[in-house]
Amino acid sequence: EAARIVEQAHPDVIDLNFGCPVKKVASKGAGAGMLQNVPLLLEITREVVKAVNVPVTVKTRLGWNKEQLIITDLAEQLQDCGIQALTIHGRTRSQMYTGEADWTLIGEVKRNPRIRIPIIGNGDIHSLAEADAAFERYSVDAVMIGRATFGCPWIFSRHELSLNEKISVLKEQLRINVEHIDEYCGILHTRRHLAASPV
């Protein structure tokens, strides 16, 4: 039912996030917490795919912990549910955001001849050069950049921006946040990103 409500907003895609490791989410069995209940994760995925007429994608992690690295089997099962793409974060839930992302299993999923859907790699990509290296080494179809964009929205630029150009981008980000959220929350949201900015 929730997916049908979301579909009324005419999204291009509905992405199911089974990757959020935050305790208040995962401890309730949501986000990466779903990795401890794969049958339910698959049932939810199948039902959402059946309920909507837009592509459904999934984002998840390698597994719950290093003893439960389930992504190679899970990728096939999710594809069988009818998803159109799979984003894999190269850490387990128990790692949260610590340590280094392990792209080895992401590469294994991509090289699996049974996998026909696009595989999107995620984790520890902080520059276009690192994204290019991930494409080259792991043959992923796309790379998702997350936290590295905080305070650094020019990360996607192919050339180094001057200080004035960076300030201009940050001003534009503030303008957009105020326009699309509201003045108070837009400023607070922008401040959080500015705190992470290397400017």
Where are these regions (language model features)?
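A short acidic, helix-capping loop that chelates divalent metal ions and anchors anionic groups
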Residues: 22-28, 92-96, 154-155
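Short secondary-structure boundary segments
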Residues: 31, 87-102
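Short glycine/serine/threonine-biased micro-segments
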Residues: 17, 29-31, 61, 88, ...
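Active-site entrance/lid segments in N-terminal catalytic domains of soluble metabolic enzymes
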Residues: 1-79
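Alpha/beta catalytic cores of nucleotide-metabolism and tRNA/nucleoside-modifying enzymes
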Residues: 43, 51-53, 67-85, 97, ...
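Active-site beta-loop-alpha junctions enriched in small/polar residues
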Residues: 19-21, 59-65, 91-93, 122-126, ...
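Short glycine-enriched, charge-decorated loop/helix-capping segments at active-site entrances
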Residues: 29-35, 95, 159-161
